[in-house]
């Protein structure tokens, strides 16, 4: 009761607002508790913003990691030849590409050979010859910190560009061969033998459409003399010979390249 006058004076100095009381533990009483908008969505974001951002960040990092993994395509395996020329009875190959497990090599005359499909990159290997580990001194080597000497090989894509080009060409040739393949049926290697009566037969009559040779036609006045009329398709890829005149023989052949026709003339003196 004795503090009533002092509280009034303090209240007047603060504009008429009463300061909330605190208990001995430092908290405010329930009746004097300040009003904080805890039910407001802005206050909720204020207290829980860090908790919400953390899982979003983890999800983004995981998504980014998946993209990086997908972008890294596996290296293509390339056939690689390993050869041991130092002799021996039993030769094995071990390397970083097979977890250093022993792989037997195949004897080829005086050498031992193995062909493995290795991914592009750097690989170390070693030979196990008649119970002894050794390396090939004629090939590149690398020495580890412990003093172990291994052979090293670089599998590069550029080393196989020629083989890739040949493979593409072979695929194109195989596609053409499928279109121009022979019909099914029995075949043999025996040459055709002419019968006696066939030797005295007259040659077959020339088909009439082959008589219309371009070189035997007159060029129209309205046409360019340097250009020939479009030939018939049956005249393509045939060799024609004109009558010998003034001691010169003229040979001609017409070929088609897409929509263009090219006629080649060969003049041969007799």
UniProtKB/Swiss-Prot annotation:
The keyword Glycoprotein does not apply. Keywords: Fatty acid biosynthesis, Fatty acid metabolism, Lipid biosynthesis, Lipid metabolism, Lipoprotein, Myristate, Phosphoprotein. Residues 1-43 are annotated as: Disordered. The keyword ATP-binding does not apply. The modification Phosphothreonine is found at residues 4, 19, 148. The glycogen-binding domain may target AMPK to glycogen so that other factors like glycogen-bound debranching enzyme or protein phosphatases can directly affect AMPK activity. AMPK is a heterotrimer of an alpha catalytic subunit (PRKAA1 or PRKAA2), a beta (PRKAB1 or PRKAB2) and a gamma non-catalytic subunits (PRKAG1, PRKAG2 or PRKAG3). Interacts with FNIP1 and FNIP2. This is 5'-AMP-activated protein kinase subunit beta-1. It comes from Homo sapiens (Human).
